[in-house]
């Protein structure tokens, strides 16, 4: 379990306003019990007045078990919200019965429901045979289908897929996407296989999942993850639709992240990175948080570092660069590069496509130290889990850590960052852009029509007639003195009123989702006096939503 400590928040980086707020309001708030709702209505007061941080008493090693790590974060959120869940139960039960019920449901939520372990043979192009290992974990079926990516990596393990599946459950709940969490992994290094061999592996893995009932539009819907993309998702969709889903009109909804020609959706490739950008945007534009960090709101003149130049890292870098932030370092598994004057994401992307690595990029120098310890405003770990640990957390110089990867921060590192007043924007919120747009793709496949197709021309004509009506009204009033009064929209407004494309709808819906979820997290952080502990606030929100589904549905066969 976690031990909670609370103290007045007097941040070393905070400006005079934040320090003043802490001095004026810490006395009142320190008198409250831990995790109790705050009375302050202004964001700055609750933020500056008090903070909770925690330490995992039973698991202090620098490389903790990944699934235990996620369970520990869950326990932290559950202990904060338990009293509220008991209070909100509208039953005739006694207080003790209500608490037993709440604790029982929390115990149901926490473990992984199903883990499928597979092994199957493939014949390689050279005639040799190889046995491939793979896993699919379904953490929760409180909502169906289950949802989660498929990754190809030699580091895949049962522990990893269980942890990632549980994160998917909480991630979907945080952004109000009605899926349960799942994850799959195939234990291979895709660089060691030809395209033909990868297709064999992908199609056979799909069939093995189908035989066990672990794939289907209403059951379990995979998506791209590490070392997989549109190509692999297309193979999965084709395999399912050509076999077990042959008579299912919704067969192509069995997987998301597909090419457009196979039922994919515009904006899915960049969705996770774009979600990372919107997530950072919502907090970096919040003056109350920035005052505690000693930063000015907005991206302008901010520096950032990206660890991992894959899909998430690239698109995060692109959007932050576009809005005025400067990327000064990029790290990959084979090395890092650095340029204090900034690195252009398009130029680096082109170089990597041509050379297969970021090393040797002519407009940056090799960086020999740890990319995580570069002096910057924003650090984006977008690689793998457990990168920020007790060992390196004291040397991290960033003021904001934006978790583009899943589980990049261990509990001990998380505690250190809270002690140092470093704002960690947690993974279960920040990288939820991918599953959000996957949800839109899934709905598109079930509806069998692209977004905007039914309304595109109607909206354009309606906007045209609205402007024409305004013009005619002005001419009736003033036209006799000066003739016609043309209404000429700006180029930007013209694009907007011409009708929203599918990409426009997806981008707008993603931005709205990330903004709404950020506001919910901020509200919870203030309500429970959590200060900069956004991770606990996000878990509290997720637990409340999942709990509500279980509680109102009832528990079968108990």
Swiss-Prot record:
Expressed in retina, testis and, at a lower level, brain. Important for recycling the chief excitatory neurotransmitter, glutamate, during neurotransmission. The gene is GLUD2. Stoichiometry shows that ADP-ribosylation occurs in one subunit per catalytically active homohexamer. One of its GO terms (molecular function) is glutamate dehydrogenase (NAD+) activity. This is Glutamate dehydrogenase 2, mitochondrial. It catalyses: L-glutamate + NAD(+) + H2O = 2-oxoglutarate + NH4(+) + NADH + H(+); L-glutamate + NADP(+) + H2O = 2-oxoglutarate + NH4(+) + NADPH + H(+). Homohexamer. Its EC number is 1.4.1.3. Residues 1-53 form a transit peptide. CDD domains: NAD_bind_1_Glu_DH. One of its GO terms (cellular component) is mitochondrial matrix. It is found in: Mitochondrion matrix. The active site is at residue 183. The lineage of its organism: Eukaryota, Metazoa, Chordata, Craniata, Vertebrata. Belongs to the Glu/Leu/Phe/Val dehydrogenases family. It comes from the Eukaryota. Substrate binds at residue 84. Keywords: ADP-ribosylation, Mitochondrion, NADP, Oxidoreductase, Transit peptide.
């Amino acid at each position: 379990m976690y031990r909670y400590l609370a103290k007045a928040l007097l941040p070393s980086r905070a400006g005079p306003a934040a320090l003043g707020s802490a001095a004026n309001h810490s006395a009142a708030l320190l008198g409250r019990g831990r995790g109790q709702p705050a009375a302050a209505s202004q964001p700055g007061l609750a933020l500056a007045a008090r903070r909770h941080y925690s330490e995992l008493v039973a698991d202090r090693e620098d490389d903790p078990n990944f699934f235990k790590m996620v369970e520990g974060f869950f326990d932290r959120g559950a202990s904060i919200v338990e009293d509220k869940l008991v209070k909100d139960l509208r039953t005739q039960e006694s207080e003790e019965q209500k608490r037993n019920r709440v604790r029982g449901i929390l115990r149901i939520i926490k473990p992984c429901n199903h883990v499928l372990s597979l092994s199957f043979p493939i014949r390689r192009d050279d005639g040799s045979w190889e046995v491939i290992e793979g896993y699919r974990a379904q953490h929760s079926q409180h909502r169906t289908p289950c949802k989660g990516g498929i990754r190809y990596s030699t580091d895949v393990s049962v522990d990893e897929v269980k942890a990632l599946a549980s994160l998917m459950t909480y991630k979907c709940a945080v952004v109000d996407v009605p899926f349960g969490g799942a994850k799959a992994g195939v234990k291979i290094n895709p660089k060691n296989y030809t395209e033909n061999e990868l297709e064999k592996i992908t199609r056979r893995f799909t069939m093995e999942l189908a035989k066990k009932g672990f794939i289907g539009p209403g059951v379990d819907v995979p998506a791209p993850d590490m070392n997989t993309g549109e190509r692999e998702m297309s193979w999965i969709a084709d395999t399912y639709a050509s076999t077990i889903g042959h008579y299912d009109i919704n067969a192509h909804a069995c997987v998301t992240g597909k090419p457009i020609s196979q039922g994919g959706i515009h904006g899915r490739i960049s969705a996770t990175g774009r979600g990372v950008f919107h997530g950072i945007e919502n907090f970096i534009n919040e003056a109350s948080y920035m005052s505690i960090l000693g930063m000015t709101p907005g991206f302008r003149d901010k520096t950032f570092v990206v660890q991992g130049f894959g899909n998430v890292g690239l698109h995060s870098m692109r959007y932050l660069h576009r809005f005025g932030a400067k990327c000064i370092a990029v790290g990959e598994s084979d090395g890092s590069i650095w340029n204090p004057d900034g690195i252009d994401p398009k130029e680096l992307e082109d170089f990597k496509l041509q050379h297969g690595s970021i090393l040797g990029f002519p407009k940056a120098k090799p960086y020999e130290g740890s990319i995580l310890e570069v002096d910057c405003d924003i650090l984006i770990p977008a690689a793998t889990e457990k990168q920020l640990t007790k060992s390196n957390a004291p040397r991290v110089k960033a003021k904001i850590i934006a978790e583009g990867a899943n589980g990049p921060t261990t509990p001990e590192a998380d505690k250190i960052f809270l002690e140092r007043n470093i704002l960690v924007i947690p993974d279960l919120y920040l990288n939820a852009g991918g599953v959000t747009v996957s949800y839109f793709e899934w709905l598109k496949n079930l509806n069998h029509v692209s977004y905007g197709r039914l309304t595109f021309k109607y909206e354009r004509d309606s906007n045209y007639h609205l402007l024409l009506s305004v013009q005619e009204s002005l001419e009736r009033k003033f036209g006799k003195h000066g003739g016609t009064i043309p209404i000429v929209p700006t180029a930007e407004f013209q694009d907007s009123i011409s009708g929203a494309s599918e990409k426009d709808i997806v981008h707008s819906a993603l931005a709205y989702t990330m903004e709404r979820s950020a506001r919910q997290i901020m509200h919870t952080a203030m309500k429970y006096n959590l200060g900069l502990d956004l991770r606990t606030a996000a878990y509290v929100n997720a637990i409340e939503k999942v709990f509500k589904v279980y509680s109102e549905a009832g528990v079968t066969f108990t």
